[in-house]
Regions:
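A short, structured loop/turn motif at beta-sheet edges
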Residues: 18-22, 87-93, 112-122
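Short beta-strand segments that buttress and anchor functional surface loops
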Residues: 56-74, 95-102
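Hydrophobic-cavity lipid-handling domains and compact docking modules
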Residues: 72-88
Length: 174
């Protein structure tokens, strides 16, 4: 029996979006994310409709750097995350995903949209990440509250720019 003990990180964040839940919900899709998120890359593996739906499967490249921005060791190749939509309810504006970075981390992402006031949406976003190995545990230790908030604030800024202008925000240079 292994002495491995998994490490888990959970974070929640509430975004405010300048649009109705009916306008925001379709953007929470691997295909539509390319419309508003600079640098978003995905490969659609399975979807009957061609967009997000229950059971939709897609992959995304894992960035070749840790959350702290440190480059991976030269012998570490970038990997792919495999995602599946585990909940999809456009009537209640709920969507959930599970994705796995093989041998390292499994992540649950749950999003619930609610109308805050006319033309404004509150997006409750919950992440739960679990290490699958010592390497995954080490990576997760960098997923602190500061890292998470920076990531979600960027998400909020980019989706809100799209909702206000109909255009993708220019990618940051540098």
């Amino acid at each position: 029996m292994s002495a491995f003990k998994s490490y888990r990180v959970s974070h929640e964040y509430v975004q405010t979006n300048p649009a109705t839940p009916e306008q925001v919900f379709p953007l929470l899709c691997p295909v539509r994310e390319a419309d508003w998120l600079p640098g978003w890359q995905y490969r659609l593996i399975y979807s009957d409709s061609g967009v997000a739906e229950l059971g939709c499967v897609f992959t995304t490249p894992n960035p070749p750097a840790s959350p702290s921005g440190q480059p991976l060791r030269p012998n570490q190749a970038a990997s792919e995350n495999t995602w599946i939509v585990t909940e999809y309810d456009p009537t209640t504006f709920r969507i959930a995903y599970v994705w796995i970075n093989p041998g390292k981390i499994i992540t649950e992402l749950r999003i619930q949209l609610t109308s805050a006031e006319p033309g404004v949406t509150r997006s409750q976003i919950c992440y739960r990440c679990t290490g699958l190995s010592e390497e995954g545990n080490r990576e997760l230790r960098g997923y602190d509250r500061k890292w998470f908030e920076a990531r979600l604030q960027n998400w909020e800024t980019t989706i809100n720019h799209y909702l206000r202008t109909g255009e993708k925000m220019p990618a940051a240079s540098g």
